[in-house]
Amino acid sequence: MESTPKKAPRSKFPALLVVALALVALVFVIWRVDSAPSTNDAYASADTIDVVPEVSGRIVELAVTDNQAVKQGDLLFRIDPRPYEANLAKAEASLAALDKQIMLTQRSVDAQQFGADSVNATVEKARAAAKQATDTLRRTEPLLKEGFVSAEDVDRARTAQRAAEADLNAVLLQAQSAASAVSGVDALVAQRAAVEADIALTKLHLEMATVRAPFDGRVISLKTSVGQFASAMRPIFTLIDTRHWYVIANFRETDLKNIRSGTPATIRLMSDSGKTFEGKVDSIGYGVLPDDGGLVLGGLPKVSRSINWVRVAQRFPVKIMVDKPDPEMFRIGASAVANLEPQ
């Protein structure tokens, strides 16, 4: 009877190798998750502005439609310019009339100035005559007691002195009148400066009646049409700044230790998860509103009672700037996935 050969014992090395590789893979995954944080709690965003007219008026031209892309300098809408054109014409007419008034007044002042120069010469002459008459009277009066002059001579000297003083006062009044005429032109020149400022302001208002795109963007929330009266500083629609797109990714606070400004990131949008976009961390949020109370700004801390022993890590927003965003894919609020590659 033949004996059956015994089977050789199987080596345990392959199984141990598989287990070892699995452990290495597990350690790598854990390390990778810890050092390269990722989150699907993210969304695309961009800066926006409210497009508001700086002057009031009726919209006579609306050059855009809702969700339309625009370039910097493109016409958005135009407010009826006629009231501002009328104000400008009125101000310019006032300036022309004032210039003519200044010219005529200047001619009169020039004539009065010429007369004032003559009056000044007359003033000096009258002042000299008054001084001479006063000196003559002062010398004549003592001679009356000595009998060298008669009382009639003294009266004539006194009359001459009074007449000279009267002539001096008269020419002094003429000089003051000439000086006041010159100051009248200064007032008109100051008034002209005010009219010029009014013209500049009216031109600015006329320019503001035409509203153009301040940057490349996309129009949203447009709910008006031609004929609508637009009030100054009241928004007409919103304009998205499409020059710079970013993703707000909410990471757990335990991941923040590996995140720095400039950390490379890979972005995927839910609308096309097969396409990736490169970016870099711009900044990390430093404040969120706690869901369970916490510190109330401007008051006392409010701490809710809890018997929950499980603490869930808080999430903080991380702003990631996208290098080359696809303008057709990126929309404010679009769901995204962010993967960081700390260096």
Curated annotation (Swiss-Prot):
Keyword Repressor: no
Alphabetic keyword roster: Antibiotic resistance, Cell inner membrane, Cell membrane, Membrane, Signal-anchor, Transmembrane, Transmembrane helix, Transport
Cellular component terms (Gene Ontology): membrane; plasma membrane; transporter complex
Cytoplasmic side of membrane: 1-12
GO biological process: response to antibiotic; sulfathiazole transmembrane transport; transmembrane transport; xenobiotic detoxification by transmembrane export across the plasma membrane
Location(s) in or outside the cell: Cell inner membrane
InterPro entries tied to this protein: CusB-like_dom_1, CusB_D23, MFP_Efflux_Pump, MFP_proteobact
Pfam families in alphabetical order: CusB_dom_1, HlyD_D23
Inducing stimuli: Induced by LeuO, part of the mdtNO operon.
Transmembrane segments: 13-33
PANTHER family: MULTIDRUG RESISTANCE PROTEIN MDTN, P-HYDROXYBENZOIC ACID EFFLUX PUMP SUBUNIT AAEA-RELATED
Family: Belongs to the membrane fusion protein (MFP) (TC 8.A.1) family.
Protein name: Multidrug resistance protein MdtN
